[in-house]
Amino acid sequence: MGIVEGITEWLPISSTGHMILVEQVVKFNASEEFMSMFRVVIQLGAILAVVVLFWNKLWPFGLRHGRVCSKPAVWQLWFKVVAATLPVLIISPLDDWMEAHFYNYITVAAMLILYGVLFLVVENRRTTPRVTKLEQISYRDALLIGVWQCLAIIPGTSRSGATIVGGLLLGLSRACVAEFTFYLAIPVMAGASLLKVVKFVVGGSVMTGTEVAVLAVGCVVAFVVSLAAIRFLMDYVKRHDFKFFGAYRIVLGIIVLAVAAATAIF
């Protein structure tokens, strides 16, 4: 699952859509409370990969003539990331309710197919992007991308998929929206992980030694695989569009529906 998380968290193909299939094949001898927490906290490894790869662009301090100085452009970037995170904070209380009512084959398959079609439509109507550099992203752009990010609360949507579609519609270049999407993940995924851990502990649950080991290994694997996935996507979007991912999502959605039908029959 660490491999699945590391790949699917950054590519706009829905980590949930893949997780729901993996869980059909790989049966974990763990409580549902742990699995609910595990699916989210494993993202910490993926977040660390972003920090490592983009450290120079994310750290707001530097050295000039032997003295520590601030980087205004980096601070501006972080303020825009915060602006994009605000809509998520508003809807975050609905997260557990959405998972309880919509974490199922039909919802996941529907979102996979819907956003697959959206990718194809958006790419077919693409014009020359008006934003090609991160510093050109306005606070309005950031806030609207944050609104698109809220749609990822529906299982099967894909956080990166929603923000990339939103960014493309707003006129961001593929490389620009992909990189900004990576940065948005840091506060959102870190906050979601912390919230899941707190709920797990407050709920009276305790991890076994095996579960601690599983979580640790999952995070490490997600980190390593994320390094490769992020590098791949940044290189890919410089030369290609997102149509392949749109088609992939549609095919995966059909597979999820087939698995749902087979599960219901057998």
What are the roles of these predicted feature ranges?
Residues M1-F266:
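Multi-pass membrane proteins that catalyze or facilitate reactions on polyprenyl-/lipid-phosphate substrates
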